């Protein structure tokens, strides 16, 4: 977590530089020295405000997660409360379109996922992100099916989002948001049909 007093103009600059360097050389090659060069600041600033590379990675992921949350909220707020299928697709778009699909963001996400398996602070951020996604999905799904069914289908959609996102991240052509929507909507329609016959 950055120390109080960190100039607000520096934080976005350092976060952007971190993602750019991870995009270029990977997480292990992304040294404090390279990041500070990219940001045009001294290494001492990173060490002083973030305690080093780990603290800067944590702040970078917080920023990415904030942007994801803001984008999802903005998309949801633009739609009627009763437009549940549209709102589910807005959640999908927040994960697959725009900022979240940029190469430097994708590579930072991959580094984050890898690191979060062995780091409590990053693992906590991952859990917060997962809970937020499931909460958004369940809110819409509960209007279409029972709470128990909504819990299961939300987990299925979240797994599809992660799987499609990971496959797209490893594909040189990147993430295909349209294909992601088709696959997930096909799954959702099948689940709705299945549960309507129960």
Curated annotation (Swiss-Prot):
Top-level taxon of the source organism = Bacteria
Residue ranges forming the DNA-binding region read: 31-50
- A Pfam family this chain is assigned to: TetR_N
Q: Which UniProt keywords apply?
A: DNA-binding, Repressor, Transcription, Transcription regulation
- Note the Gene3D superfamilies from the entry: Tetracycline Repressor, domain 2 (1.10.357.10)
Q: Which GO terms describe its biological process?
A: glycine betaine biosynthetic process from choline; negative regulation of DNA-templated transcription
Residue stretches making up the HTH tetR-type domain: 8-68
What InterPro entries has UniProt attached to this entry? BetI_C (IPR039538), DNA-bd_HTH_TetR-type_CS (IPR023772), Homeodomain-like_sf (IPR009057), HTH-type_TetR-like_transc_reg (IPR050109), HTH_TetR (IPR001647), Tet_transcr_reg_TetR-rel_C_sf (IPR036271), Tscrpt_rep_BetI (IPR017757)
Pathway of action: Amine and polyamine biosynthesis; betaine biosynthesis via choline pathway [regulation]
Q: Give this protein's Gene Ontology molecular function annotations.
A: DNA-binding transcription factor activity; transcription cis-regulatory region binding
Q: Which PANTHER family match?
A: HTH-TYPE TRANSCRIPTIONAL REGULATOR BETI, HTH-TYPE TRANSCRIPTIONAL REGULATOR RUTR
Q: What does this protein do?
A: Repressor involved in the biosynthesis of the osmoprotectant glycine betaine. It represses transcription of the choline transporter BetT and the genes of BetAB involved in the synthesis of glycine betaine.
> What is the protein name for this chain?
HTH-type transcriptional regulator BetI
């Amino acid at each position: 977590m950055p120390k109080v007093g960190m100039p607000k103009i520096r934080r976005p600059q350092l976060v952007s530089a971190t993602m750019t360097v991870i995009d270029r050389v990977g997480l292990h090659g992304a040294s404090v020295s390279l990041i500070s060069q990219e940001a045009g600041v001294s290494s001492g600033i990173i060490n002083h405000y973030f305690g080093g590379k780990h603290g800067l990675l944590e702040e970078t992921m917080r920023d990415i997660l904030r942007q994801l949350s803001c984008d999802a909220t903005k998309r949801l707020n633009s739609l009627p409360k009763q437009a549940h299928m549209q709102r589910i697709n807005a959640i999908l778009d927040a994960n697959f379109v725009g900022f979240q699909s940029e190469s430097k963001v994708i590579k930072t996400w991959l580094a984050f996922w890898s690191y979060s398996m062995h780091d409590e602070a990053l693992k906590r951020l991952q859990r917060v992100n997962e809970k937020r996604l499931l909460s958004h999905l369940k809110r819409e799904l509960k209007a279409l099916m029972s709470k128990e069914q909504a819990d299961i289908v939300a987990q299925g959609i979240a797994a599809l989002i992660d799987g499609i996102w990971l496959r797209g991240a490893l594909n040189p052509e990147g993430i295909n948001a349209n294909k992601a929507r088709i696959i997930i909507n096909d799954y959702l329609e099948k689940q709705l049909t299945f549960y309507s016959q129960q």
